Amino acid sequence: MNLSATLVLAFAMSMDAFAASIGKGASLHKPRFREAIRTGLIFGVIEAITPLIGWCIGLFASQYILEWDHWIAFSLLFILGCRMIFEGAKQQVEETEKMRSHSFWVLVMTAIATSLDAMAIGVGLAFLQVNIVHTAMAIGLATMIMATLGMLIGRYIGPLLGKRAEIIGGIVLIGIGFNILYEHIYRLA
């Protein structure tokens, strides 16, 4: 996977955290910069660890299903993208976004909940020739940036963007999945 695809993937994976941090920022009267940085760090670290875990799981299984790797990566990205679009399209506000408490453990649990898709992406990346450390670092850094920004601007754009950030992220993931499939089919032709 080239640098531009890695960056697109990293920012697509950060959309869940961005949407969650917008909700958290919107729930505070005036989020402080320190609170935004803390939120970004928690989300970023967890989001960087989960694709590594997924990659290890996928690497173990990859020796058994190498000939199906592109279909697996496409399927995971497509399913996760559709899930993100569906979640973004829901009109209900989730309980995690309603909470006013921003304790360490609340942030950790929210970060874990928003990073499970990154673990599944890690499984899919095990079937591709990628540098997982660089990819995980890019995902973590993008998530840290987006979660921090989401906290700071959440009170301003929360009502305007909110869950649409997840829809955008889902569309990007589906696009990456189709790109992986296209590249594989093009190589066979």
Swiss-Prot record:
It comes from the Bacteria. Its main location: membrane. It is a multi-pass membrane protein. GO terms for molecular function: manganese ion transmembrane transporter activity. One of its GO terms (cellular component) is plasma membrane. It is found in: Cell inner membrane. The chain crosses the membrane at residues 3-23, 41-61, 65-85, 104-124, 132-152, 165-185. Keywords: Cell inner membrane, Cell membrane, Ion transport, Manganese, Membrane, Transmembrane, Transmembrane helix, Transport. It holds the Pfam family Mntp. Belongs to the MntP (TC 9.B.29) family. HAMAP family: MntP_pump (MF_01521). Probably functions as a manganese efflux pump. NCBIfam families: PRK11469.1. This is Putative manganese efflux pump MntP. It comes from Yersinia enterocolitica serotype O:8 / biotype 1B (strain NCTC 13174 / 8081). The lineage of its organism: Bacteria, Pseudomonadati, Pseudomonadota, Gammaproteobacteria, Enterobacterales.
